[in-house]
């Protein structure tokens, strides 16, 4: 009976100790992440405020352009820039395809956004959604 009591007592003790170390490590990691995020926000904010762009400063890339619609997508190698009829612009992932011709078209900054390929979620598909066709 004494052995059973020792085993149960040890189990509770180990559980409490592991909970203490896990929780302490978890809080420390969370605190470090919060500090890093605050630094990132602070440096972004400082770059945004220190920018002397006389026109429009793109919020995602900090590029200085004439107008909002001239902003590039933040990841142009993997995104298409789709222009909506209301003047807004959205960036979507380029469709995944193994067809070299389509890859070349989607990589072209002029032809890619104008492409409308059946079965692909490209800018043509986005316009269909915008128009309520899908």
Curated annotation (Swiss-Prot):
InterPro entries: LCL2 (IPR034543). It comes from the Eukaryota. GO terms for biological process: ERAD pathway. Keywords: Signal. Residues 1-19 form the signal peptide. Probable component of the endoplasmic reticulum-associated degradation (ERAD) pathway. Belongs to the LCL2 family. This is Long chronological lifespan protein 2.
